[in-house]
Amino acid sequence: MDATIAPHRIPPEMPQYGEENHIFELMQNMLEQLLIHQPEDPIPFMIQHLHRDNDNVPRIVILGPPASGKTTIAMWLCKHLNSSLLTLENLILNEFSYTATEARRLYLQRKTVPSALLVQLIQERLAEEDCIKQGWILDGIPETREQALRIQTLGITPRHVIVLSAPDTVLIERNLGKRIDPQTGEIYHTTFDWPPESEIQNRLMVPEDISELETAQKLLEYHRNIVRVIPSYPKILKVISADQPCVDVFYQALTYVQSNHRTNAPFTPRVLLLGPVGSGKSLQAALLAQKYRLVNVCCGQLLKEAVADRTTFGELIQPFFEKEMAVPDSLLMKVLSQRLDQQDCIQKGWVLHGVPRDLDQAHLLNRLGYNPNRVFFLNVPFDSIMERLTLRRIDPVTGERYHLMYKPPPTMEIQARLLQNPKDAEEQVKLKMDLFYRNSADLEQLYGSAITLNGDQDPYTVFEYIESGIINPLPKKIP
């Protein structure tokens, strides 16, 4: 980029590189850590931070009333995410920590640990290698606003906070059937989650303090504290109903912790819409262009415009149009490159449809540097496609378009003169759909982070799903 020439134009490769490698988020995380820890020499600190490479490890807090299942969900998440579980019990059982020994002594006397001591235990545990490299999950901590503020003061910030919720009557009834395996720490229930193995059944123990009165007292204290804890975690907190099967709660929690929060990183949408003929790609592209000022790039329309304008490429394309043959990929990509390299596409972003039709075209797009950052597959059943396309008609006198089911002509006279576009004939539609589905599996494999949508619903409902997929960051893929 020549510094002596104005106005400056940023090459499209620069923002694309920054976006793909999360440069903005990396710099933001380093700045946050610098402000939190305030090291005397920032350079070695930043180098150490980069070596850790732990910006995206799980940092999760799970809160909830007694018997809501938070410990079970926390243990399942730990196994799935390979993270460290931090509970009050395992924090005070650390035999190599003087702080833990003192906390254990106080806990045996008072059945509670002072907030300052508990937060010190958490700080010591989070400084260990497994928590730094693999992440952590706090189970039932913080319990009070004081604990939440002390944790925040030390710069310990979770990425996701989950609060489980259920009616008190359900929790009291559930707590009465609670059983614990003393060997593994696994929690079972006499009604909802009874182990099939007789060996485990025989060693299960009834925990203390699960009577109806004691549970009600704990619930009262929880409700008094949680309303003051929740405001400490705006924008990163999700409430999940615990009054449903444990597996459903787990999958909702897992989906949430795999999601990424919206950032202030600059983002230029490069949207690719894929789907069979008649799936609504053109309509969705027009809606996106209208609302977000994206450049609507329709491959077929570009080719027609090139022919109509009698450009150099248009003259090469015209013979293929006249013979009703497919335009070669090399020529098609040159026309497409010419459009996507224009400044409006670089600055505003684009929504592309009509290409790629197969894996070769997709690889060509990638090699040319036109990598979409959002890909959507619009799935529509075969019968719905046939209904949408084969019943379309046009009035040759007025040019008005009709649909025999959704927008029938007002009079018999108009209906008698309606014509069908040859492209909407049943055989033509079947051929196009067959061609798409032959290549769709390869395209789905190539675009692994693509979002699949049900296109057989109201167009504005589909648009809302697409809009949500563009605005929100893509979820993390955790094996």
Curated annotation (Swiss-Prot):
Its main location: cytoplasm. The keyword Lyase does not apply. AMP 1 binds at G140, I141, P142, E143, Q147, R203. It catalyses: AMP + ATP = 2 ADP; a 2'-deoxyribonucleoside 5'-diphosphate + ATP = a 2'-deoxyribonucleoside 5'-triphosphate + ADP; a ribonucleoside 5'-diphosphate + ATP = a ribonucleoside 5'-triphosphate + ADP. Residues 391-424 are annotated as: LID 2. ATP 2 binds at G278, S279, G280, K281, S282, L283, R392. Residues 177-206 are annotated as: LID 1. Residues 269-471 are annotated as: Adenylate kinase 2. Residues 58-258 are annotated as: Adenylate kinase 1. It comes from the Eukaryota. ATP 1 binds at A67, S68, G69, K70, T71, T72. AMP 2 binds at M325, A326, V327, G354, V355, P356, R357, Q361. GO terms for cellular component: 9+2 motile cilium; axoneme; cytoplasm; cytosol; sperm flagellum. Residues 87-113 are annotated as: NMP 1. It is found in: Cytoplasm, Cytosol; Cytoplasm, Cytoskeleton, Cilium axoneme. Residues 298-327 are annotated as: NMP 2. Its EC number is 2.7.4.3, 2.7.4.6. Keywords: ATP-binding, Cell projection, Cytoplasm, Cytoskeleton, Kinase, Nucleotide-binding, Transferase. One of its GO terms (biological process) is ventricular system development. Nucleoside monophosphate (NMP) kinase that catalyzes the reversible transfer of the terminal phosphate group between nucleoside triphosphates and monophosphates. Has highest activity toward AMP, and weaker activity toward dAMP, CMP and dCMP. Also displays broad nucleoside diphosphate kinase activity. Belongs to the adenylate kinase family. This is Adenylate kinase 8. The lineage of its organism: Eukaryota, Metazoa, Chordata, Craniata, Vertebrata.
